[in-house]
């Protein structure tokens, strides 16, 4: 493929934008460097770069594009918003309709509040949990990304009962000491940390199904232990469903798992491709939010008509019978094809899949937590990524990220992808 125009775009971007990208995950640093491909158009399961190359898209904008690019029903809603006003700074009927749709889909949310991103949603659930409990510490799990605000950019200490350390320049030690980080799917480490700090913890923040070091499901009984211990210690449970909500079925991962968190943070999919965040939970907890209570949260763009109408339209599309089953079916075909190709070419991988999302790890270790995900060979993944890109298959440029199917992928797309995987693996072996 010719990428001359993409290279020129990146060279110009480096003159004006920090690192040439507006999010570090878009850089190709983790796959050996080079100029990121600059896209110009998307439709359905595909997008096209500035050089005219077409790609089957499994990035899906890191998850939000579950209905594919440019879905006509969502595009119509966005056009209506553009023609009738995208921002009023007042209440609208759209936010009421959308909030009710979210409540019906995720029954743990008695009340909802909108904001502008998953980061904002998680950040505010922590503030609300602190206000409600009167405590300050939070617990999170290693490798789970919850946004870029200070409190969640904290690495684990030297053991499960130790305080966290800053995971980014600019995060203070005092902030890090408010965070306890433990391994996902490790009941012993979790229990030890809760025995040490449980009475000081305001909330346990967790992805019910991990999406940020690949697709990793909780082991049987692990989330149940988290809930039971939180209740015993008087801490709240916060589910970060920014990736998982409406990705695997119509509703939250919590519905699939049969569990009820105290608070839930949403984003990505629910915006229909526009910026959005939302959070919700039990009425008595949510009533601590201003103007009813002392926990302040506001936003000029929160609940804007464009995002609300796009979100409503997206959820209407996702109510179509059978679409999640079809993504699961296609995901199964893709999984079988990848595993068969790996066996044929002697490439060592572990593959985790849940319905229409999967991750390939270049390791022989079963991946159930972040430490095991780190075993995936980044150098091999970088080569694989570029081999796939040159065949017109676009993946996230990181060994930790998931492949996301959309409602617009077809079996022909899957077979074309498997053919590309076969060639890529043949070059790696």
From Swiss-Prot:
The modification N6-(pyridoxal phosphate)lysine is found at residue 268. One of its GO terms (biological process) is protoporphyrinogen IX biosynthetic process. Pfam families: Aminotran_3. It is found in: Cytoplasm. It catalyses: (S)-4-amino-5-oxopentanoate = 5-aminolevulinate. One of its GO terms (molecular function) is pyridoxal phosphate binding. Its cofactor is pyridoxal 5'-phosphate. InterPro entries: 4pyrrol_synth_GluAld_NH2Trfase, Aminotrans_3, PyrdxlP-dep_Trfase, PyrdxlP-dep_Trfase_major, PyrdxlP-dep_Trfase_small. It comes from the Bacteria. GO terms for cellular component: cytoplasm. Its EC number is 5.4.3.8. Keywords: Cytoplasm, Isomerase, Porphyrin biosynthesis, Pyridoxal phosphate. Gene3D superfamilies: Aspartate Aminotransferase, domain 1, Type I PLP-dependent aspartate aminotransferase-like (Major domain). Pathway: Porphyrin-containing compound metabolism; protoporphyrin-IX biosynthesis; 5-aminolevulinate from L-glutamyl-tRNA(Glu): step 2/2. Belongs to the class-III pyridoxal-phosphate-dependent aminotransferase family. HemL subfamily. Homodimer. NCBIfam families: hemL (TIGR00713), PRK00062.1 (NF000818), PRK12389.1 (NF009055). This is Glutamate-1-semialdehyde 2,1-aminomutase 1. It comes from Lysinibacillus sphaericus (strain C3-41).
């Amino acid at each position: 493929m010719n990428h001359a125009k993409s290279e020129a775009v990146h060279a110009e971007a480096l003159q004006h934008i920090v690192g040439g990208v507006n999010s570090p995950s878009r850089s190709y640093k983790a796959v050996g460097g080079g100029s990121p491909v600059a896209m110009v158009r998307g439709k359905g399961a595909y997008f096209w770069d500035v050089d005219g190359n077409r790609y089957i898209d499994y990035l899906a904008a890191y998850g939000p594009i579950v209905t594919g690019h440019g879905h006509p029903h969502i595009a119509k809603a966005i056009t209506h918003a553009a023609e009738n006003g995208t921002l009023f700074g007042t209440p609208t009927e759209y936010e009421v309709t959308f909030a009710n749709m979210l409540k019906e889909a995720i029954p743990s949310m008695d009340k909802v509040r909108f904001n502008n991103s998953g980061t904002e949603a998680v950040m505010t659930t922590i503030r609300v949990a602190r206000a409600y409990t009167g405590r300050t510490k939070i617990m999170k799990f290693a490798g789970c990304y919850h946004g870029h605000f200070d409190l969640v950019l904290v690495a684990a200490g030297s053991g499960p009962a130790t305080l966290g350390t800053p995971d980014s320049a600019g995060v203070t030690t005092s902030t890090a000491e408010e965070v306890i980080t433990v391994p996902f799917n490790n009941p012993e480490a979790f229990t030890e940390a809760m025995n040490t700090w449980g009475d000081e913890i305001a909330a346990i923040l967790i992805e019910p199904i991990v999406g940020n070091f690949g697709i990793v499901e909780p082991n049987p009984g692990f989330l149940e232990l988290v809930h039971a211990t939180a209740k015993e210690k008087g801490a709240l449970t916060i589910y970060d469903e920014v990736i998982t909500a409406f990705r695997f079925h119509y509703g939250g991962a919590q519905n699939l798992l049969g569990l009820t968190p105290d608070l839930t943070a949403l984003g990505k999919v629910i915006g229909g491709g526009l910026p959005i965040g939302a959070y919700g939970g039990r009425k008595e907890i949510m009533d601590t939010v201003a103007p009813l209570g002392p926990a302040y949260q506001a936003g000029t763009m929160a609940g804007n008509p464009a995002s609300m109408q796009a979100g409503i339209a997206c959820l209407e599309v996702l109510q179509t019978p059978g679409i999640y089953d079809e993504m699961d079916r296609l995901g199964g075909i893709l999984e079988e094809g990848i595993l068969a190709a790996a066996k044929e070419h002697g490439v060592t991988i572990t593959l985790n899949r849940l319905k229409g999302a999967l991750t390939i790890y270049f390791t022989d270790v079963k991946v159930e937590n972040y430490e095991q995900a780190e075993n995936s060979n980044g150098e091999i993944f970088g080569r694989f990524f570029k081999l796939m890109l040159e065949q017109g298959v676009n993946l996230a440029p990181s060994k930790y990220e998931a492949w996301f199917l959309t409602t617009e992928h077809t079996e022909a797309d899957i077979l074309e992808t498997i053919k590309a995987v076969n060639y890529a693996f043949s070059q790696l072996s």
